[in-house]
């Protein structure tokens, strides 16, 4: 592994452990020339998974596309990068275990929406506003009503749990 500082081609592994997602190995390395320490990640090469887009075209599954959409939706929200990474890992794991060779972009979008609904309501609404391509204000109001009902249901369950 080349050193990111001096570009020397030899480094030694100082520490190695499984990352939080369980599918990645995190390694701390040290350059044998300049002694700079840096981190690398190793993961199993996945078989290509194709995403069938709404227009029928196919493209390779991209974890980064999902990550970028979620990061944009979570801007200026109290959502940590660790939370986002965990959401993306769960989505990718569900996609890879549920679908063999191809998955529709709609199925991926629905998985993202499900995860964001649990993570942060505002992030969910922001993502939905782009993903769902609302035609008018009534559709947005309907989504907000669904979220409000779900939040009220959660609060009601919490209150019932506290009184029992």
From Swiss-Prot:
What sequence ranges are listed for the domain ATP-cone?
A: 49-139
- The superkingdom listed in its UniProt entry is Bacteria
Which UniProt keywords are given for this protein, alphabetically ordered? ATP-binding, DNA-binding, Metal-binding, Nucleotide-binding, Repressor, Transcription, Transcription regulation, Zinc, Zinc-finger
Q: Give the note describing cofactor binding and stoichiometry.
A: Binds 1 zinc ion.
Q: Which GO terms describe its biological process?
A: negative regulation of DNA-templated transcription
Decide whether keyword Repeat is in the record: no
Q: Which cofactors?
A: Zn(2+)
Q: Which GO MF terms does the UniProt record name?
A: ATP binding; DNA binding; zinc ion binding
Zinc-finger (unnamed) residue ranges come to 3-34
Which InterPro entries does the entry link to?
ATP-cone_dom, NrdR-like_N, RNR_NrdR-like
* Record-stated family: Belongs to the NrdR family.
Q: Give the function comment from the record.
A: Negatively regulates transcription of bacterial ribonucleotide reductase nrd genes and operons by binding to NrdR-boxes.
Which protein, by its recorded name, is this? Transcriptional repressor NrdR
Protein's organism: Streptococcus pyogenes serotype M6 (strain ATCC BAA-946 / MGAS10394)
């Amino acid at each position: 592994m080349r050193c990111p500082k001096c570009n020397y081609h030899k480094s030694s592994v100082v520490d190695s452990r499984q990352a939080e997602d369980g599918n990645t190995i995190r390694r701390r390395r040290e350059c044998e020339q300049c002694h700079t320490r840096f981190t690398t990640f190793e993961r199993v090469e996945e078989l290509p998974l194709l995403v069938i887009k709404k227009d029928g075209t196919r493209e390779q599954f991209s974890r980064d596309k999902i990550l970028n959409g979620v990061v944009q939706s979570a801007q200026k929200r109290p959502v940590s990068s660790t939370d986002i990474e965990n959401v993306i890992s769960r989505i990718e794991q569900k996609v890879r275990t549920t679908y063999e060779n191809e998955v529709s972009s709609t199925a991926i979008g629905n998985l993202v929406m499900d995860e964001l609904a649990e993570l942060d309501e505002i992030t969910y609404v922001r993502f939905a506003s782009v993903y769902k391509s609302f035609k008018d204000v009534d559709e947005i109001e309907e989504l907000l009503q669904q979220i409000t009902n779900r939040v009220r249901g959660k609060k009601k369950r919490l209150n019932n749990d506290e009184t029992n």
